[in-house]
């Protein structure tokens, strides 16, 4: 696949129009706002920066790299292992449900294209959105670094749009957050791509608490 087409496929995977329900989740932010943990643009930036450096840097991106390489090597067993590892590191039932819902949605998209139909791959694809992104990234010859940055920006954009509704703040602040937090993505990715297996795993106690409390939050806009 030529580089122009690979770029277009990456934009498709990173698009908010990808039918995986990206903007229906806040990943605990909704309860953090209600609890008073996040009250301002600065508070939101600090909340997301923690997740960027911990969850993205030590879990999502390193796992994405391993999933991608498993796809390149046509190793469904390794792919399934890291898919299960990712799901096991989602610390609440709500976050695990979000992961499998996103994964199933992307797997259904692959079904429509008659891709990833081998049961050895299909079962792993249903476990996480990262699995589907890795599979399509390898299939479409999207370079790993580009794929990871596209995924990271899509994650950040979804979080900022949730913040617009919840904190709240305006579009100027939203774009400034995307600009400023986005500048940190390449350095975090550099570190994520050189981690050894035993260094992987995310753990943010406040995020886990917020997600747990959100499960029973009386009035809410988001599914997580």
UniProtKB/Swiss-Prot annotation:
> Which keywords fit this entry according to its UniProt record?
Chaperone, Cytoplasm, Nickel insertion
**Pfam families for the chain:** UreF
Q: Where in the cell is it found?
A: Cytoplasm
Q: InterPro entries in the record, alphabetically?
A: UreF (IPR002639), UreF_sf (IPR038277)
**Presence of keyword Chaperone:** yes
GO CC field: cytoplasm
Q: Does the keyword Cytoplasm apply?
A: yes
Listed GO molecular functions? nickel cation binding
Please report which protein family the annotation says this sequence is part of.
Belongs to the UreF family.
Q: How does it assemble?
A: UreD, UreF and UreG form a complex that acts as a GTP-hydrolysis-dependent molecular chaperone, activating the urease apoprotein by helping to assemble the nickel containing metallocenter of UreC. The UreE protein probably delivers the nickel.
Protein's job: Required for maturation of urease via the functional incorporation of the urease nickel metallocenter.
Name this protein carries in UniProt = Urease accessory protein UreF
């Amino acid at each position: 696949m030529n580089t122009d087409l690979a770029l277009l496929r990456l934009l498709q995977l990173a698009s908010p129009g990808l039918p995986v329900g990206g903007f229906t989740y806040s990943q605990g932010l909704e309860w953090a706002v209600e609890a008073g943990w996040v009250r301002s643009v600065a508070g939101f930036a600090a909340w997301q920066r923690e997740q960027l450096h911990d969850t993205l840097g030590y879990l999502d991106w390193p796992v994405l790299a391993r999933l991608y390489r498993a796809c390149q090597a046509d190793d469904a067993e390794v792919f399934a292992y890291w898919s299960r590892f990712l799901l096991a590191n989602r610390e609440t039932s709500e976050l695990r449900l979000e992961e499998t819902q996103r994964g199933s949605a992307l797997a259904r998209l692959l079904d429509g294209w008659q891709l990833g139909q081998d049961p050895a791959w299909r079962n792993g694809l249903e476990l996480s959105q990262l699995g589907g992104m890795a599979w399509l990234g390898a299939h479409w010859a999207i370079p790993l670094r580009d794929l990871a940055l596209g995924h990271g920006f899509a994650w950040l954009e979804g979080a900022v749009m949730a913040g617009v509704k919840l904190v709240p703040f305006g579009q100027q602040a939203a774009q400034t957050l995307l600009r400023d937090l986005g500048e940190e993505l390449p350095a975090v990715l550099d570190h994520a791509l050189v981690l050894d297996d035993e260094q992987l795993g995310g753990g943010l106690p406040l995020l886990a608490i917020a997600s747990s409390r959100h499960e029973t939050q009386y009035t809410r806009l988001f599914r997580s």
